[in-house]
Amino acid sequence: MKLALISDLHANREAFSAVLEHARAHGAGRFALLGDLVGYGGDPAWVVDQVRELVQQGAIAVMGNHDSAIVTGPLPTMREDARDAILWTRSQLDAAQLAFLAALPMHREADDCLFVHANAFDPQGFEYIQGRLEAMRSLHATQCRYTFCGHMHEPKLYHLSGTGKAGEFVPSPGVEIPLLPNRQWLVIPGSCGQPRDGNPAACYALFDMTTGLLSYQRVPYDVDAAAARVRHCGLNETVAERLAQRLLQGE
């Protein structure tokens, strides 16, 4: 069975729709949503409803820092654009949608897999995995062979051998990577709704749980339409324009 790993949707309806269609066309039978369903994008209610429906069908979903901020309020450390988007997003969600976000777990374990938004060593702290040091700290914090996480908006792959040797890899889209069973693996699929590597195409990954093959995917979508939704959603015009440009430029 193929598992679609989708993270950092950020209320981007166009990107999420394209990724769902692509994943299903490539054999995905199950979905894991790795947090930050909302924030930045112009369609939070639609995205939350889609994720809630997937969860009802058996998908895994965990809480991201933007999802948490919707429930508890923006953190003081959040940038102005993120804070404004959080406050606007909260006004767009009904009680049931807010309750769904509030009930999301910080992490889930299933079939030797850990699903978490930021890291395994402090899921609620939302510390970034910016390199090998944080990745190894995360891998040492779990007994699971596979850790799937988001938060970082660029695709990356880390591994830890039985002898303690660490490695990291920047994957190429569409290339199957065998996740060897004698290692631990940390998979960051990149952002579906707001990639930040200079390429606006949506990111996600497919993991074949039978063969152990992982592939990172890039999915072009109507980024102009997504940017237009942000511009006209009701956010402050200056903030909305900055967020729209980030989508268009993949940053």
What are the functions of these language-model segments?
Residues 2-6, 11-98:
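Core catalytic region of metal-dependent phosphoesterases/phosphodiesterases
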Residues 10-15, 39-41, 66-71, 121-123, ...:
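Active-site environment of divalent metal-dependent phosphoester hydrolases
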Residues 32, 60-62, 116, 148, ...:
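Hydrophobic/aromatic beta-strand patches that form the interior of the parallel beta-sheet core
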Residues 45-47, 129-136, 168-170:
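Charged helix-capping and loop-helix junction motifs
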Residues 162-251:
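Acidic, His/Gly-rich catalytic cores of divalent-metal-dependent hydrolytic chemistry
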